[in-house]
Structures are given as C-alpha cells and as structure tokens.
Curated annotation (Swiss-Prot):
It comes from the Bacteria. This is Large ribosomal subunit protein uL4. GO terms for cellular component: ribonucleoprotein complex; ribosome. SUPFAM superfamilies: Ribosomal protein L4. HAMAP family: Ribosomal_uL4_B. One of the primary rRNA binding proteins, this protein initially binds near the 5'-end of the 23S rRNA. It is important during the early stages of 50S assembly. It makes multiple contacts with different domains of the 23S rRNA in the assembled 50S subunit and ribosome. Belongs to the universal ribosomal protein uL4 family. GO terms for molecular function: rRNA binding; structural constituent of ribosome. Residues 53-76 are annotated as: Disordered.
Length: 207
C-alpha cells in the first residue's frame, strides 16, 4: 500500500489515501497493454465497407453476343469482373473487427495503464468533484487549480451529469466512470484526475 496526496478542487492538499500497489504500482506489461489498445481500436472500426460482386451489379442478364462466329472472345455477361463496370472479385464485405480478450488480461492491462500513469506522475486524486450546476468556466478553473495539461481523463465513481456537461465543451477533456474505465482512454490522456471514491472502487474491482 502506498500513500497518495488527495487534493481539493482549489488545488490545496486535503489529506492522503492508501491505494493498493497491486493496482497502482505494478510493473506495466507492455505486451498486454498493446493487445488491449489494439482490441479497443479494432472494436471502434465501423466495418461497413462493401463493394458489389458480379451477382450484385445491375444489368448483364443477357449474353452480349453469340458464342461463336464473331471472332471476338466469348463473353457471358457484361458484368463479369474483366468488364468496365463489372463486379469486384474478393472485395471487402461488411464485417465486425471486434474480438475478445481474456478477463485476466483485460484487468492486467488496466492495472498496467494505471501504474504507468502513476510512474509518469500523471495521476491526480481529488476528494470530490461536487458541482451545483453544469458550469464549463467553473470546471476549467478546477482543472487549472489542479495544474492539469490539455488532455485529461476525469474519473468519477458514478455518472455525474454536472461534471459530464461541464467538461463536454472543453477540448481534450473526457469524463468517464470507475466502471467505464478503459485502457485506451487512460493511455490517450496526458493526465488522469480521479476522485477518491472512484479510486477505491477501481481498487476493489481490480485488486
């Protein structure tokens, strides 16, 4: 167990919290991180690419000329692949690029990503993010007080509408919950701001 400073929204220290080394201080497994990031990126692909093969192209039902006697090569349809406007051979078809990863590997990837952020001094623990109403200006002030870079991932224990709406119009700032935490979001951000309760929940799930 290691102690981490807990900050208030004004940037001052309010105390400290003990977090498990098994979640926030392991040696990052780069191979598993690589696989987890590839998996997420593959799942984000639309996979809607499509072309028409010779059966899908319109027309070509009639034989263009008779089989013999013209001196030309025999042809059965003007929609065969060798014709201009004909069907495509072995073209892309709609498909899903997503695949699965074992649960243990997914959790190891998350622990590795969090530990990597801790090693980079890119993890900030705050006591709470209590906003009375969605205020972008107020939330920008909070991030400024916490001395955060432009690309920030904000993690709350559960869905917080005020925080989500406040951060929505700030470029580079993304909000997620402890349950929705994922490797791609963590590694894409320059810094992770996590509430104390969210950190405990992540520790409970991954520990």
């Amino acid at each position: 167990m290691a102690n981490y400073d807990v900050l208030k929204v004004d940037g001052t220290k309010s105390g400290s919290v003990e977090l498990s080394d098994a979640v926030f201080a392991i040696e990052p497994n780069n191979n598993v991180l690589f696989e987890a990031i590839n998996l997420q990126r593959a799942s984000l692909r639309q996979g809607t690419h499509a072309v028409k093969n010779r059966s899908a192209v319109r027309g070509g039902g009639r034989k263009p000329w008779r089989q013999k006697g013209t001196g030309r090569a025999r042809q059965g349809t003007i929609r065969a692949p060798q014709w201009r406007g004909g069907g495509i051979v072995f073209g892309p078809t709609p498909r899903s690029y997503s695949y699965k990863m074992p649960k243990k590997m997914r959790r190891l990837a998350l622990r590795s990503a969090l530990s990597f952020k801790v090693q980079e001094k890119g993890l900030t623990v705050v006591d709470a993010l209590n906003l009375d109403a969605p205020k972008t200006k107020e939330f920008k002030t909070v991030l400024s007080n916490l001395e955060q870079p432009k690309k920030v991932l904000v993690v709350t224990e559960s869905e917080d509408v005020n925080v989500a709406l406040s951060a929505r119009n700030i470029p580079g700032v993304q909000v997620t919950t402890a349950q929705g935490l994922n490797v791609l979001d963590i590694t894409s951000a320059d810094s992770v701001v996590i509430t104390e309760s969210a950190a405990k929940k992540v520790e409970e799930v991954l520990g």
